[in-house]
From Swiss-Prot:
Protein name, per record: Carboxy-S-adenosyl-L-methionine synthase
Source organism: Cronobacter sakazakii (strain ATCC BAA-894)
Role: Catalyzes the conversion of S-adenosyl-L-methionine (SAM) to carboxy-S-adenosyl-L-methionine (Cx-SAM).
Catalytic activity: prephenate + S-adenosyl-L-methionine = carboxy-S-adenosyl-L-methionine + 3-phenylpyruvate + H2O
Alphabetic keyword roster: S-adenosyl-L-methionine, Transferase
Family designation: Belongs to the class I-like SAM-binding methyltransferase superfamily. Cx-SAM synthase family.
Subunit note: Homodimer.
Amino acid sequence: MSNRDTLFSAPIARLGDWTFDERVAEVFPDMIQRSVPGYSNIISMIGMLAERFVQPASQVYDLGCSLGAATLSVRRNVHHDGCKIIAVDNSPAMVERCRRHIDAFKAQTPVEVIEDDIRNITIENASMVVLNFTLQFLNPDDRQLLLNKIFQGLNPGGALVLSEKFSFEDSVVGELLFNMHHDFKRANGYSELEISQKRSMLENVMLTDSVETHKARLRKAGFEHSELWFQCFNFGSLVAVKGGSAT
């Protein structure tokens, strides 16, 4: 069971940049449920997408896997032989807990949990790739390169699921959804101090893009088909499909 997130309930004299360290890993399930609207729905529907897109004898990549929620959702819905899930995160604390979490659930489809920068991972024979609130933490200059790499490593008919916090070109809409997200966090028990301190730590490391920017990158990578399939306030998820049929 996850501990309750109280990391920012008291004033912090020096707020550094956000890191996914042991303290965050310990409370991460509670933190993300109370901070990201629609997170549980996205996780469960990633499993539904896996049932539709994962091909026999192929690989699934969960890039930025944190504690493995998306990996487990995929594995519950893979019914083909010869498949493998590769879950990657660069946080030692997340990887250690992810391995324990994955090992607690037995299933036919093997999972390899790798501690590494997702930019170092070779994508090959992939029928599905998941970037679940991960791309926003990469240097913007590296985002197109990663999407290009994913497209090249996907099999025809394969899919990329890209979940992100969004910015908005329309400032009125952006402010409305920003405020509604803060209302959501308040309703989930976060104080103004907690919200403010966490935002200050994230603002230099989590750089968001608009849906239009994401779609433009996906097109540039080679994806002919992409669409927003889920959105709640300023959070959402896109699916991009590589053209052609699975062999």
